Structures are given as C-alpha cells and as structure tokens.
C-alpha cells in the first residue's frame, strides 16, 4: 500500500520544473507580432471542467497572439435553461453567418442533471440542435502522438470517420406485434392519395417486433458533398460503406448518390490531387480498415458511424485525443469541438480545491481546427501556421513526457504526470518556441 501511495504522489514532482520553464519563456509571446484576423469566429462556451479549461485556452493560448473578434455565446446549461435554449439556436445561426464556430463541450441533461441544475425541462443536445440547423456531417479524427500506444499498431496514419447523423434507426418507428397479423408498409404521395403504394412486409404467426425507417435525398446528397469536401481538405481518399447487396434500394440510394456527386463535382479535383473515391460493403470495409495503415476518410451511415467512430477512437488510444468537426455541404461552414464530455468528476474535485489532471488537448484542437479553417477561408497564412504550431506544441509536450494522468496511464512515462494547469503552462512554453519560425 505504501508503494502505491508513493507512486500516486510522485508524478506531480515534474510540475514545478515545468512551471518555472514556462515563466522563463513568457517574454517570447509578448514580442510576437500579433496576427490580425479579418473575420469573426463564433465562440461557444460550455460546462464544468471543460469550461474552466476553455477560458484558460482562450486567455493564455489564443488572445495573446492575435487580434480577433470572438462572437461569444454561452452554451452552459444554466444559460440554455434561462433562454429556453434560444441561445443554442442563435449560436448556430451565427455560425451560418460567419462560417466558423468553435465549441466547448456541453452537458446534455438527463433526469439527474435536470434535478442537479433545477432545469425547466430536459433540453435537447446542443450538438444535435446545431447539427440540424447547419445540416452538416460530423467527422472525428485522432490526434497521433508517438509515445501513446495504439491498440492497432498498424494505424500509423489517421482515419477520419464521418457519420451521417440523420434518419435511419435513430428516427425510426418501431412496434411490438402482439400476436399473429399482417405487417404492411405504405406510402401516399402528397396531393394524390389514389396513388397510394402498399407493400406486404411480413405475416406474423405469433408475436414479434418491427421497424420502419427513412432518409431523404437532400440529406444523403448533403452528406456526400460534406464527405468529398472533407477528403479534399485532408488530401485523403474517401470510402463510403453500405450494405447495398441486402438493402438494394435503401443503401443503393446512398451508393448511387455518392457516385453521381463524385462524377459531377469532384472527380477531376480528386484526380488532380492523386486521390480516389470507392464504395465498399461495410463488412469488407471494416476488414480492410483493420489491415490498412490508415490515411483515409470513411463515410458511414448513421448506425455504422455511431459504432465505428467509437471503435476507431479507442483503437487509436484515447477518446481524449479525438477531434470532432462538423462540415456543411458547401465546404465553408464549419464547427469544431472536442469529442469528449465535460469531465464532471474532475470538476467536482476542482470545486473542492483539489488538484486535477485533466487532458486539455482535444479542447485546444477545437480552437486550432476552427482557427485554421478561418485562416484558409480568409487567405490568412499566418493564422494557419499559428494553429499548426499550437497543435505541434501539444504533441511535442506529450512526446517529451509532459502529460496528464490519462495519457500517463497509457504511456507509462517515467516522468509521471502533471496537473491540468501545469500542462497548459507547458504547452504555452512549447508554443513560444514553435512561433520563432512564424514570420
């Protein structure tokens, strides 16, 4: 038991040296010529421990280096409750107007949260609200760090996985058949009820279950455009996975739509960059992905994406090292956030004045991905370089052995781990070193 206590206590010894080093480097951020950002970025604040971290990132790692207008929206649970969630709608509309949004992790309340925060009602997921208004596709991509082991060692390049988060099982109607009877599916064209189509689905001899689901051509087409846009942005090939051999009309619609969009709008651009697009059956795609070294964008239907995004995240090592971005079909409108939650357990410790070792990397990357997109849209090369430098600073810290507890437990670093704020100090120090190369 004594050995365990010593092991838990020792890791924080690295912190004092890390903080002192940061103070010696602070002058370089003051001498850095600030980047002028021409157009606004929508900033959406969040909840709990990620909200605490979010403010530090903004004040320590972003604002000292640039003149930027942040169109701020507080999406913390209390603000959403106070405005009857109108603040979330307003934030989404602001993203549509300004093209770039950067979001902190937020609480999606369940019954316990409604009671904890004395909420008026169980508000919907702000991510879902924003996604529906923006009509975009969410893509998750791992942050690769050499000394963080992967469960699939062969994945030396990132897999960027897109989930078509509309329709299918998640908007289905299901039922329990209480006994023998006929199950039918019907469609009545609007304005022409006499053209009603009815299909016999199954003749039940006893009790059972049934489900009906749908998707729309507009949503599938938007999903296709978002996927091709992401592949072009990442300069990676794109794969779509379905089961069209079984669902010939349903999944066949996805396959045909993607092929049409590719041929009409993206084939030439892909070929110029040496990229390709392929459709694969979902089972074959999973097998090929496992054998591959990564390095592609994977467009998944709703259920497949729900499952495979978590599989991919875990296989790369940690959900705390996953980025999440939402891309509109136009390729311009963009929202980024961390792929994880609000880290409630650490927040409870923080409120009690206890030290926490919370991983801030995904939250930092939410800022960098949004700033880089703003830079690309505005033709602001210095902003893009700054975003890349901040990402490199995070990675270099971990590769030097400066990391939070979650990554320490994965890497077994001999240096131990630092606390939440010491890691952010170390990132700033590393960033100042990186910025020497930015004119």
Swiss-Prot record:
Q: Does the keyword Mitochondrion apply?
A: yes
Report whether Transit peptide shows up as a keyword of the record.
yes
Cite the residue span of the transit peptide: 1-26
Under Enzyme Commission nomenclature, its number is 1.1.1.42
Name of this protein:
Probable isocitrate dehydrogenase [NADP], mitochondrial
Positions of Mn(2+) binding: 283, 306
Q: Name one GO molecular function term.
A: NAD binding
Q: For this UniProt entry, what is the primary localization, expressed as one broad class?
A: mitochondrion
- The gene it comes from is idp1
Which UniProt key words apply to this protein?
Magnesium, Manganese, Metal-binding, Mitochondrion, NADP, Oxidoreductase, Transit peptide, Tricarboxylic acid cycle
Q: Which reaction does it catalyse?
A: D-threo-isocitrate + NADP(+) = 2-oxoglutarate + CO2 + NADPH
Q: Which GO terms describe its biological process?
A: isocitrate metabolic process; NADP metabolic process; tricarboxylic acid cycle
């Amino acid at each position: 038991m004594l050995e365990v206590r010593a092991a838990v206590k020792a890791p924080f010894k690295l912190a004092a040296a890390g903080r002192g080093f940061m103070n010696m480097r602070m002058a370089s951020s003051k001498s850095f010529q600030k980047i002028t950002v021409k157009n606004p970025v929508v900033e959406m604040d969040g909840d709990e421990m990620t909200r605490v971290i979010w403010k530090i990132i903004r004040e320590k790692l972003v604002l000292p280096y640039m003149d930027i207008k942040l169109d701020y929206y507080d999406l913390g649970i209390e603000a959403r409750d106070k405005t009857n969630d109108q603040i979330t709608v307003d934030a989404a509309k602001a993203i549509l107007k300004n093209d770039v949004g950067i979001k902190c992790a937020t609480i999606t309340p369940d019954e316990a949260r409604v009671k904890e925060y004395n909420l008026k009602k169980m508000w919907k997921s702000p991510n879902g609200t924003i996604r529906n208004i923006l009509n975009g596709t969410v893509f998750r991509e791992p942050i690769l760090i050499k000394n963080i082991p992967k469960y699939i060692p062969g994945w030396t390049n990132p897999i960027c996985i897109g989930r078509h988060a509309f329709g299918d099982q998640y908007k289905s109607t299901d039922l329990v058949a209480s006994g023998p009877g006929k199950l039918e599916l019907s469609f009545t064209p609007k304005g022409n009820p006499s053209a009603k189509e009815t299909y016999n689905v199954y003749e039940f001899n006893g009790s059972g279950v049934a489900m009906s689901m749908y998707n729309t051509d507009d949503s599938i087409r938007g999903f296709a455009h978002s996927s091709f846009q992401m592949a072009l942005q990442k300069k990676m090939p794109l794969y779509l996975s379905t089961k069209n051999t079984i669902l010939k009309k349903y999944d066949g619609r996805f396959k045909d739509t993607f092929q049409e969009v590719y041929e009409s709008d993206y084939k030439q651009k892909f070929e110029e960059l040496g990229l390709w697009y392929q459709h694969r059956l979902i089972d074959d795609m999973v097998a090929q992905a496992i054998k591959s070294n990564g390095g592609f964008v994977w467009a998944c239907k709703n259920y497949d994406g729900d499952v495979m995004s978590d599989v991919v995240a875990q296989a790369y090592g940690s959900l705390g090292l996953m980025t999440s971005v939402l891309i509109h079909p136009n390729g311009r409108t963009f929202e980024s956030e961390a792929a994880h939650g609000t880290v409630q357990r650490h927040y409870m410790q923080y409120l009690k004045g206890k030290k926490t070792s919370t991983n801030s990397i995904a939250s930092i990357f939410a800022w960098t991905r949004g700033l880089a997109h703003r830079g690309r849209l505005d033709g602001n090369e210095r902003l893009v370089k700054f975003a890349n430098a901040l990402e490199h600073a995070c990675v270099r810290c971990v590769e030097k052995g400066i990391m939070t507890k979650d990554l320490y437990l994965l890497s077994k670093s001999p240096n131990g781990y630092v606390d939440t704020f010491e890691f952010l100090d170390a990132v700033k120090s590393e960033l100042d070193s990186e910025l020497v190369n930015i004119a």
